[in-house]
Amino acid sequence: AFTVANHVKNSTATIIVQCTADSALPELDTVTDGKLDNNADWDGTTVPKDYDFCFAWETDTQYYAEEWQNHFLNINNWIVNNAEERKIKYVIHTGDIVDDVDMTYEWENADEAMGILDKAGMSYGVLGGNHDVAAGLADYENYYKYFGENRFKSQNTYGESYKNNKGHYDLISEGGQDFIIVYMSWNIYQEEIDWMN
């Protein structure tokens, strides 16, 4: 259970809320009535007794790697600590792991945070977003160093790598269903499309 006491330091609670308004711009309105209107009806599928398994999804952790490392650690600790109860079988990270491609400390922070999943034996995959590879410059040096094929190839879900994990696919079988989860990082051209096909 979430308790305020666990999040107060020096009489201050720092709370980061990420959400998107209908316009796809960040929502900055103060929530005073205890709910955030996102025009989505909850169908109850997040109650563990109502589903057989689930995948956790992370994305855009760049600001956590840059400045809010504790939140990045907390996210992955929560996933690991709740994997059994929530039936989490796999984690998907869809990029922007770090904010600045050339800031080593951000990669080290991300490495530590994602290492929580490694240590727990939780299978996961990542891809390089525009922040991770300097967008149009396609600078994959740090991405390859910290999140290249060697990090993942021992996972039992890891299928095949494309150019040192610029792309890869994972194979997952759960609840009588088979999944192919395909990852492809930023700056794709016909060669990458051909590989995915």
Task: Identify the role of each PLM range.
Residues 7, 60-62, 130-131:
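Histidine-centered active-site/metal-ligand motif
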Residues 15-17:
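C-terminal edge beta-strand
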Residues 34-37, 103-194:
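Extended active-site neighborhood of metal-dependent phosphoesterases/phosphodiesterases
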Residues 2-10, 20-22, 42-43:
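Short, compositionally biased P/S/T/A/G/V-rich stretches that sit at domain boundaries
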Residues 22-105, 187:
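N-terminal active-site segment of His-dependent metallophosphoesterases
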Residues 74-82, 112-116, 195:
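A generic secondary-structure signal
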Residues 7-10, 29, 86, 120, ...:
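Glycine-centered loop/turn motifs
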Residues 20-21, 194-197:
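Short, intrinsically disordered, charge-balanced linker/junction segments flanking boundaries
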